[in-house]
């Protein structure tokens, strides 16, 4: 109703529930949806594709897997870890999905914001092999 009166232009919703997301994608009430999607949580990939096909904007939350995983990952990197599971690659993973409109990674430090912007600005395409490696490694580690 507020849209009809010109008070608002768009309506969005945030959810962690796949069941709720399915109802949103099938309905006509929302213009955007904010969902969790990452190599740690790829279960929403198909629903993101369906939302995009219905012209529903998709905002990805927690593309790095959440603060606990991110802190642990950065600790591993500082200790010499050299696998594929890095914050940069996780951002690439989320941004590579054609149905994703934008991602909102959390950042506790200004340097992380700069790193995230640089990743998004200079993002190399993610190959299918890289995607598979990220999903496999995230499943093993977490």
Could you describe each region identified by the protein language model?
Residues 2, 39-46:
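Short N-terminal helix-initiation segments at or just after the protein's N-terminus
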Residues 9-17, 34-41:
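Catalytic beta/alpha-barrel core
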Residues 6-14, 106, 129:
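Glycine-centered small-residue hotspots that permit tight backbone geometry or close packing
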Residues 22, 26-32, 44-142:
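Structured C-terminal cap/extension of enzyme domains
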Residues 1-12, 30, 57:
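Short beta-strand/loop segments at the ligand-binding rim of alpha/beta enzyme cores
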